[in-house]
Amino acid sequence: MKTLYSLRRFYPVETLFNGTLSLGGRDQETTGFAWWAGNARLINLSGKLLGAHVAHAGLIVFWAGAMNLFEVAHFVPEKPMYEQGLILLPHLATLGWGVGPGGEVIDTFPYFVSGVLHLISSAVLGFGGIYHALIGPETLEESFPFFGYVWKDKNKMTTILGIHLILLGAGAFLLVFKALYFGGVYDTWAPGGGDVRKITNLTLSPSVIFGYLLRSPFGGEGWIVGVDNLEDIIGGHVWLGSICIFGGIWHILTKPFAWARRAFIWSGEAYLSYSQGALSIFGFTACCFVWFNNTAYPSEFYGPTGPEASQAQAFTFLVRDQRLGANIGSAQGPTGLGKYLMRSPTGEIIFGGETMRFWDLRAPWLEPLRGPNGLDLSKLKKDIQPWQERRSAEYMTHAPLGSLNSVGGVATEINAVNYVSPRSWLSTSHFVLGFFFFVGHLWHAGRARAAAAGFEKGIDRDTEPVLSMTPLN
């Protein structure tokens, strides 16, 4: 493969502890990168880079399969999923596999099948990764020109982008087909308690779907995180899948316009930085989704959201004290506001106390008690059902709180059972990963831009103090 520029010009870092260390033509002398720079040594070896990526995919899928089987092996059907530290089975249950009314697990075999399928897939990917890393051609350009590429080839790069977009679109449509034709998905809002149902009446109105993107990110609006029905979620995936597929076809058939050629840096490291920027946004969005949304992430599987646990506690004590004779409509709390009920700034009747900040929570166990103007006092006095009391007591004691200081009034107990909500795990991990990807995006974008501008020098070693010191040995 012809190299269009001197590697040294772009990768001039020249510090190797052992200058003779050679890695099969992938040493520092030939690539400009030391062993610890990992895949950077493979920038111009498309065959070996393919091996690294396939092997990486194998590791990801192996984790999914192994962890899936680990969760199946440890699963106790009598306990809720969120009490058992599970993060994969809740996703499978949300897709409608193995669960029945109320989110009760009736069959764990689909979970076992999922784990085995992922393990088998990981073996295939692992073999492919090892083959391309060790045996296959170092570069693909000569033998398989369709799979070969030069990083500067703008047309080829947008073709690869298009292929990726089509695959993402197909993934979005897999969820649509599951919800429409293959057994449906779990709907926490199904009448009479959550249940698996086919989503028939999709929301395809662009004003509704794209309206989410224009909403405020705060409060009950919550940008796209505020979606509260499966019709909108599945309809959104129809739109998203269609846009990805048509965008992919567009990028395969067209060449980048002049403004795009000028605006972007066209190098491997630049593409890495763009991808990390996208993954960072995904991570932060997923963090907010799993923390606040109880439709895409049903509380039956993931445990209550923070606001949900807080409102559940207010409801639980309202029920208790009403039974003991309290007049919940007029009792005054220590601040002079209503102890059990008060009014929101816009006049709705809401729960009183510290949970007032979560007044715009919506949850399946609470909505039946609302009227046209917030909570309905007569329903609270006459219509509370035993299942609502049980659900709120359960959620009150399973708040997704670590050692937070501000817990929305939820009673915290230092000697409580060792419980960490999957919402805590998933939102924290995705926030941290989103942040790290953002830092990686800045780092690689800066390096790529500097290299393109021609002043990427690495660290100047000539004036380093260590050079004038006595060797340690």
Swiss-Prot record:
Cofactor, how bound (note): Binds multiple chlorophylls and provides some of the ligands for the Ca-4Mn-5O cluster of the oxygen-evolving complex. It may also provide a ligand for a Cl- that is required for oxygen evolution. PSII binds additional chlorophylls, carotenoids and specific lipids.
Chaperone as UniProt keyword: no
Chain positions with N-acetylthreonine modification: 15
Entry keyword annotation includes Transcription: no
Maturation-removed propeptide residues: 1-14
Membrane-topology annotation of the record: Multi-pass membrane protein
Listed GO biological process terms: photosynthetic electron transport in photosystem II
Protein residues bound to [CaMn4O5] cluster: 367
InterPro entries: PS_antenna-like, PS_II_antenna-like_sf, PSII_PsbC, PSII_PsbC_sf
Segments traversing the membrane: 69-93, 134-155, 178-200, 255-275, 291-312, 447-471
Family: Belongs to the PsbB/PsbC family. PsbC subfamily.
Annotated protein name in UniProt: Photosystem II CP43 reaction center protein
Organism of origin: Angiopteris evecta
